[in-house]
């Protein structure tokens, strides 16, 4: 792919000119703020840059590039913004490099050499003779209509029969004749362009040579490639139409031409051949092929002869592109359509990738669900096997279990301790201190329940707050003496200590102290001598427990304090 500059009226492309003379730089698509600045500078309507869009280095100032070695490629600064766009137009207008300009210039030189083949009058003119051109042209304007057969009457006759006109012209009129020849050559060059544009406009988009507007609209399959190849022709032809290679005529030549026009329209048809006839009503080059001409004045007969001659000779494709102003606009519009189609194609590809990604995720989820279903199926099969294996023991188990699964009713004896029932979890973690131990924290889970008997069942299970490893364990029963508030707390611990504590319950507070303590023979020292516990339900509905103890080496000291939050009733 050949890299081309995306700026309007810029035909720089890769491989054109000297190496490293022009460098190309991509649009900053990832930097939105800088991209907006670039787009404002380029000033292209209905156009979106892609990763294949470039700007050449001629649109940037010298301070926009980073300092590098001479043999290294140019590198734009992160803040560089294009700002030079009018200089490129001046460059083309001054000396340019378009193929159409070379062709027109070559044609002018050919006509000049043909006009001055028999005599060297134009080459031997001095500066003093050139100064005489203006007064001589005025004399030519005041000449009588009887001399219409002379070269001054029909400029076409000058280009067709230069030898005869030079013989009939006196020597003192050499300078006006030379200037008239140059004017005829310029008018002939303009007439060629006007002839091509008028033939394209009169044919309504299709002339007798077989070239129509349909030639510029290829089938949809290769539209983008065709539009990309015609993009350079569009800009070059547009530049040629805006700035023709023929220099402007001086004011005196224009006056001479306007004076000659009414004379040549009436008498010079028979004397001038149709191949060299000139038109006096030029048509605007920017007119579209389908639009009607704005000038409705009748055309001279010379122009009619010229149109017949132009229809008889087929034109080349380059002349059609240069003359048909609507074709270039069509190419520009198709070029923007091409880029929009590419952009839509990239968006479709992106959407396809996202859909494929989502389909892959959905497939993995389905596989996980199928694996989970298979695991559930296996568990159900194992459960059925266990049920079948336990069938012989069902009559025996049914005799042990109660006939109904309803929870038992609370015994009225333990009603004063009903506020302790439920499952409790520590919140926050409990704190443990003792003079012979390092301070520590722990988590604890408490279950206090009943089975309808005049007692409560309890279990205390503590865990490490970080590793959640089991620590202290104890379980037992809480009994009340009927018709009193005396309470007995019987506990067995995993440290090998069994104790019986007794106390009283007052409202929602229970205080007990050790009555007897027993331990295994290999229990660790120092041995616990006395323990006190205090349970209290605070105003927030949380259960608090405080434990104090005395050993053989330490007096009664607070050992544990923890607060529980009720999880289940």
UniProtKB/Swiss-Prot annotation:
Keywords: Cytoplasm, DNA-binding, Heme, Iron, Isomerase, Metal-binding, Nucleus, Phosphoprotein, Zinc, Zinc-finger. Transmembrane segments: none annotated. The keyword Zinc-finger applies. Residues 196-210, 280-289 have a biased composition (Low complexity). InterPro entries: Calycin, Nitrobindin, THAP4-like_heme-bd, THAP_Znf, THAP_Znf_sf. Residues 242-262 have a biased composition (Basic and acidic residues). Heme-binding protein able to scavenge peroxynitrite and to protect free L-tyrosine against peroxynitrite-mediated nitration, by acting as a peroxynitrite isomerase that converts peroxynitrite to nitrate. Therefore, this protein likely plays a role in peroxynitrite sensing and in the detoxification of reactive nitrogen and oxygen species (RNS and ROS, respectively). Is able to bind nitric oxide (NO) in vitro, but may act as a sensor of peroxynitrite levels in vivo, possibly modulating the transcriptional activity residing in the N-terminal region. This is Peroxynitrite isomerase THAP4. It comes from Rattus norvegicus.
């Amino acid at each position: 792919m050949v890299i081309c500059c995306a700026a309007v009226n810029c035909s720089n492309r890769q491989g054109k000119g000297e190496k490293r003379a022009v460098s190309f730089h991509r649009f900053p698509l990832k930097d939105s703020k800088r991209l907006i600045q670039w787009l404002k500078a380029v000033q292209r309507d209905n156009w979106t840059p892609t990763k294949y869009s470039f700007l050449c280095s001629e649109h940037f100032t010298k301070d926009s590039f980073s300092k590098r070695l001479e043999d290294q490629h140019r590198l734009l600064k992160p803040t560089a913004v294009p700002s030079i766009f009018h200089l490129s137009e001046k460059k083309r207008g001054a000396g340019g490099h378009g193929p159409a300009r070379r062709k027109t210039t070559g044609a002018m030189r050919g006509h000049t050499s043909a006009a001055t083949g028999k005599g060297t009058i134009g080459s031997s003119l001095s500066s003093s003779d050139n100064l005489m051109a203006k007064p001589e042209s005025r004399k030519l304007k005041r000449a009588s209509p009887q001399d219409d057969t002379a070269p001054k009457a029909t400029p076409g006759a000058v280009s067709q029969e230069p030898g005869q006109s030079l013989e009939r012209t006196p020597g003192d009129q050499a300078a006006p004749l030379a200037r008239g020849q140059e004017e005829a050559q310029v008018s002939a060059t303009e007439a060629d362009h006007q002839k091509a544009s008028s033939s394209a406009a009169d044919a309504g988009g299709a002339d007798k040579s077989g070239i129509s507007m349909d030639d510029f609209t290829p089938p949809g399959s290769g539209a983008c490639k065709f539009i990309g190849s015609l993009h350079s022709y569009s800009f070059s032809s547009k530049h040629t139409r805006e700035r023709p290679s023929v220099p402007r005529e001086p004011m005196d030549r224009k006056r001479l031409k306007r004076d000659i026009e009414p004379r040549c329209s009436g008498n010079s048809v028979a004397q001038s051949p149709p191949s060299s006839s000139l038109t006096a009503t030029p048509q605007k080059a920017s007119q579209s092929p389908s639009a009607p001409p704005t000038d409705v004045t009748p055309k001279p007969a010379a122009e009619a002869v010229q149109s017949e001659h132009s229809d008889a000779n087929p034109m080349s494709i380059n002349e059609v592109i240069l003359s048909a102003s609507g074709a270039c606009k069509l190419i520009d519009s198709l070029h923007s359509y091409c880029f929009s189609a590419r952009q839509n194609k990239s968006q479709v590809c992106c959407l396809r990738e996202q859909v494929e990604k989502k389909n892959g995720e959905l497939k993995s989820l389905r596989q996980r669900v199928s694996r989970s279903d298979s695991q559930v199926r296996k568990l159900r099969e194992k459960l059925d096997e266990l049920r079948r294996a336990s069938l012989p023991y069902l009559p025996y188990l049914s005799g042990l279990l109660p006939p109904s699964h309803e929870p038992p009713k609370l015994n009225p004896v333990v009603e004063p301790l009903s506020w302790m029932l439920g499952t409790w979890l520590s919140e926050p973690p409990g704190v443990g201190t003792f003079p012979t131990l390092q301070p520590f924290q722990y988590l604890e889970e408490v279950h206090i329940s009943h089975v309808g008997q005049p007692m409560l069942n309890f279990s205390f299970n503590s865990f490490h707050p970080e590793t959640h490893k089991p620590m202290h364990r104890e379980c037992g029963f809480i009994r009340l003496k009927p018709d009193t508030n005396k309470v007995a707390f019987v506990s067995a611990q995993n440290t090998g200590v069994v104790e019986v504590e007794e106390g009283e319950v007052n409202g929602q507070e229970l205080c007990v102290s050790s009555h007897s303590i027993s331990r295994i023979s290999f229990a660790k020292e120092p041995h616990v001598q006395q323990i006190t516990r205090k349970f209290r339900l605070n105003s927030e509905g949380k259960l608090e427990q405080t434990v104090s103890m005395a050993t053989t080496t330490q007096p009664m000291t607070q050992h544990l304090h923890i607060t529980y939050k009720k999880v289940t009733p």
